[in-house]
Amino acid sequence: MTGRILSITVDLTPTVQNHAGLGRYAEEITRALFASCQPDERMCAFYTDPHRRRLSPPLDQLPASTLTLPNKLWRSKVMLAYALHLPQNQAIGQPDVFFATDHLLPYLPGAIKHFLLADLSFLSHSQTHTFLNRTFLQLMVPRFLRAADAVIAISQCTLQEALSRYPFIGNKGYVAYPGVGQHFRPVLDPARLDSVRARYHLPERFVLYVGTIEPRKNLVMLLGAFRQASLADLKLVIVGKRGWLFQEALARVHELGLEDQVIWTGFVPDDDLPALYSLAQVFAYPSLFEGFGLPVAEAMACGTPVLCSNTSSLPEVAGDAALLLPPTDVCAWSQALVRIVQDVSLHADLRERGLRQAKRFTWEASANLVRALYRELYARHP
C-alpha cells in the first residue's frame, strides 16, 4: 500500500430489501470485513431501495450512497451505462474497490470490481425465474463477469459450472463460502426453547424446513414424502416467507389432507432460528438446486440431523454429515424420514458429524479471502 486510504464499497441492496440468500451473504460478509477493517481501509455501503429502509447496526455506521429507484429502473440504468460507456460514479461515489453482491455490477471503470456469483439458475433452471429476470441475467451476467476483476462464487459447484459456461473467467474465479453465524449453536436453555415453542405454536416433535416457499425448494415432494411416512406423532413445520408461485405448496397440503399436520410460521427472525433448529427432530431440505444451501449448514451447527438433496452444491455443504437423496424420489425421502426419527444411533451420529462439518464455514475466513484478493489486486492496479 502507498499510505493512502483504500475505499471499499459493498452493494447492500439485497440486504436492505430482505432478499434471503444474497441479502444474508452481503450483510454477513460486510459485517466480517467491517469488524476486521484495516487502518488504511474505509468501508462504505451502497444500496437502492424505493421504500427508504435503513441498514441495521452495526452496518448503519457505514458511510452510504443510496438511491430510491425501483429495481427494474436501476437495472435499466446499468444496462444503458454499459451500452453507452457511461460511468456511474455519480450514484455510487469513487470507490477503489466495489463488491457487487446482487448479480448487478454498475459501470465503474477504474475501480477494482468483485462480482458475487450465487448460482446460474437463470440458465440451468430458467423456469424458476420470471421472463424479465431471466432475460436480464442471461444478457448481462456475461458482461458483468467480463468486467469483474474477481468472480467470487459461493461454492465450488457454482464456480465449476460458471467456468464451463464462461471459460473466459479463467483464473479470476474464487470460492468464498457463506459462513454460519456464531449464534447458530445447540440451544440448551429450557426457558428459551419453551419461549420459541410458544411463540410459533410448535408441537413437541416435528420435521423442520427453513427457506423461501417457491417451486425450486421442492416442498411439493417433501409434503408427499411426509404424508407417506405416516409419522403420527410428528408434524411438519415450514419456516420462510412466501416466494414465487408459493400457491403450489399450499394447494398440495389441501390435496393431501395435511391441514392439521403442517404448520406455517412465515418469516422467522435470525435470533429465533437456532432454537427452532434445536427443537426439531430432523431438518429436511429437498431443494432441486442451490448455489450453496446455508440452512443445511445452520441446522448442522445447531446439532439437528439433516436430510437433504444430493444435487448441485448440497453434497459439498453436507459432506458425510447428512443423508443425501435424489430430490424427486418420494419413497426414498419417506423412508429416510422414518429412519432418522426412529434410529437413535443414526440420529446421534448425524448430530455429531453435523456439528463438525458446520465448523468449516465461517464468515471470517471468507472475509479474509475477499480482503486478500482486493488488496492484491489493488497493489497491482495501475
Please name every model-derived segment:
Residues 1-382:
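Carbohydrate transferase catalytic cores enriched for Leloir-type hexosyltransferases
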